[in-house]
């Protein structure tokens, strides 16, 4: 492979998020549902025989060794003793700190893409275990299927929720995930429910009230758009989203977003666009 290959690095949404327990070690147990979107960043890969990992887009103020894309490539290279190299670029569309998985998705696309084109031969499950050291959400993107997660997020069950259309908006604020989970008003004892029951109920997010109470930018945007649609938080934010049956309905609401707010329209995908492109089996048999 000498030509440049462009691979999708999709966004994800947490369609619901419930916190069921805080353990003695400080970790929170949860129930959440991840789904991919047909919108995201693009990762370019150009594999070569140099043995070097070259980043074509440096992030200002971030050392190469701290860059998740570089770390993912080096991790796979070292783990498999691969002698090949690559030039890697990224076209960013997803907002930083939006809670839609940009950095984790980038790392996963690099792992999956280089494993494919370097022919290093790891299974998706092996790649997911490797990716966990890069971030808790990386295995979600590596496995490539919409998933119901329990525990501290490590127990995954393949799931096929409806593939709706979404409007996703990014309030002009950064939210500290750690601060949200440390907040004394965060619910921590939501009763556990079966997946079948959860799929039949209206979905909410236990973090949303805490975030709306502390960040007026989120509260005001949700309130301003309430006359058009009900938006809710994904993860700990800052992004919010609303669900629609058709692209036309989504476009009609998107037209009412404030001009200074970043946003996009996307369709839910139960199979990652990356895995569709590479024709990788993703749903457990």
From Swiss-Prot:
Signal peptide: none annotated. One of its GO terms (molecular function) is ATP binding. This is 4-diphosphocytidyl-2-C-methyl-D-erythritol kinase. The keyword tRNA processing does not apply. Disulfide bonds: none annotated. Its EC number is 2.7.1.148. One of its GO terms (biological process) is terpenoid biosynthetic process. The active site is at residues 12, 137. ATP binds at residues 95-105. The lineage of its organism: Bacteria, Pseudomonadati, Pseudomonadota, Gammaproteobacteria, Pasteurellales. SUPFAM superfamilies: GHMP Kinase, C-terminal domain, Ribosomal protein S5 domain 2-like. Catalyzes the phosphorylation of the position 2 hydroxy group of 4-diphosphocytidyl-2C-methyl-D-erythritol. Pathway: Isoprenoid biosynthesis; isopentenyl diphosphate biosynthesis via DXP pathway; isopentenyl diphosphate from 1-deoxy-D-xylulose 5-phosphate: step 3/6. The keyword Oxidoreductase does not apply. Belongs to the GHMP kinase family. IspE subfamily. It comes from Actinobacillus pleuropneumoniae serotype 7 (strain AP76).
């Amino acid at each position: 492979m000498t030509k440049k290959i462009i691979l999708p690095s999709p966004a994800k949404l947490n369609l619901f998020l419930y916190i069921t327990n805080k353990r003695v070690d400080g970790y929170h147990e949860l129930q959440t549902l991840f789904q991919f979107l047909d919108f995201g960043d693009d990762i370019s890969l150009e594999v070569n025989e140099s043995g070097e990992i070259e980043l074509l887009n440096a992030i200002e103020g971030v050392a190469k060794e701290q860059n998740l894309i570089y770390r993912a490539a080096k991790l796979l290279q070292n783990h498999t003793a691969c002698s090949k190299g690559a030039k890697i670029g990224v076209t960013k569309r997803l907002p930083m700190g939006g809670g839609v998985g940009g950095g984790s998705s980038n790392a996963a696309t690099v792992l999956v893409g280089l494993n494919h084109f370097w022919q290093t031969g790891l299974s998706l499950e092996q790649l997911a275990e490797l990716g966990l050291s890069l971030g808790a959400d990386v295995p979600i993107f590596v496995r490539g299927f919409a998933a119901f997660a329990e525990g501290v997020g490590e127990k995954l069950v393949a799931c096929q929720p409806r593939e709706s259309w979404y409007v996703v908006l990014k309030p002009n604020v950064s939210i500290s995930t750690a601060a949200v989970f440390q907040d004394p008003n965060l619910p921590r004892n939501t009763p556990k429910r079966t997946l079948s029951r959860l799929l039949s109920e209206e979905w909410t997010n236990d973090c949303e009230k805490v975030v709306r109470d502390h960040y007026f930018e989120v509260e005001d945007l949700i309130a301003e758009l309430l006359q058009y649609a009900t938006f809710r938080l994904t993860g700990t934010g800052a992004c919010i989203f609303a669900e629609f049956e058709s692209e036309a309905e989504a476009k009609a609401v998107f037209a009412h977003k404030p001009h200074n707010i970043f946003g996009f329209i996307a369709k839910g995908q139960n199979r990652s666009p990356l895995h569709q492109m590479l024709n990788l089996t993703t749903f457990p048999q």
